Regions:
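C-terminal interaction surface of TIR/SEFIR-family domains
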Residues: 4-6, 123-168
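Secondary-structure junction/capping motif
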Residues: 36-38, 100-104, 133
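Proline-rich low-complexity regions
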Residues: 37, 118-121, 134-135
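Short, glycine/charged-enriched secondary-structure capping and boundary segments
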Residues: 22-25, 84-87, 135-137
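Conserved beta-strand-loop-alpha-helix hinge of the TIR/SEFIR fold
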Residues: 62-110, 115-126
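Conserved N-terminal substructure of TIR/SEFIR domains
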Residues: 1-68, 167-168
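Short catalytic/ligand-binding loop motif for oxyanion handling, primarily in non-cytosolic enzymes
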Residues: 16-19, 78-82, 128-134
């Protein structure tokens, strides 16, 4: 039996690393009340020289241990193509039967939706723009929240309120 105790964070790790780092800082800091077990501590879902299918397999295993799903949306999230099988070095010789032309982010989002994980969407911006959100989660997320206030400062209280909605 798998115990779902983690929170899975999906993001364009190139363009929105600052937002991921901010969540991590709030999670690890003693001052803040944001507290979650990071699913990425289980195995790496980072793109490197590993076959894209192996990375997606690791991501799905991490998602299987996750109770919640957080998508960070930035300016290029919807256009990110990292993880498409056709971009994999082993595409022509790949023996995996579950090849998919979904990016890592699209794969993660669809997996979360198919497994009924509660989802929140955090925008690495001072406004919510649902047109930038991945299609599979835009209408099922419990909350869509901007991570920045009108002065482009990190908005902890709004993010915390969104996390609090996950448990409801």
């Amino acid at each position: 039996m798998i115990y779902r105790t983690r929170t899975y964070i999906a993001a364009d790790w190139t363009g929105d690393k600052d937002a991921v780092n901010q969540l991590t800082m709030w999670n690890e800091g003693k001052k803040w009340g944001l507290s979650f077990g990071d699913a990425h501590e289980l195995s790496s879902c980072r793109s490197d020289d590993t076959n894209n299918c192996n990375i997606k397999k690791n991501c799905s295993q991490n998602l299987d241990h996750s109770k919640y799903f957080v998508l960070i949306v930035g300016d290029k999230t919807k256009d990110t193509r990292a993880g498409y099988c056709m971009y994999c070095k082993a595409y022509n010789t790949c023996s995996y039967t579950y090849k998919t032309n979904k990016s890592f982010i699209e794969f993660e989002c669809k997996y979360a939706v198919n497994n009924n994980l509660p989802i929140i969407v955090l925008y690495n911006s001072n406004k919510v723009d649902k047109s930038k959100c991945i299609d599979s989660v835009v209408n099922v997320a419990k909350a869509h929240v901007a991570m920045n206030d009108n002065y482009n400062n990190w908005d902890y209280l709004s993010v915390k309120a969104a996390f609090d909605m996950l448990g409801k």
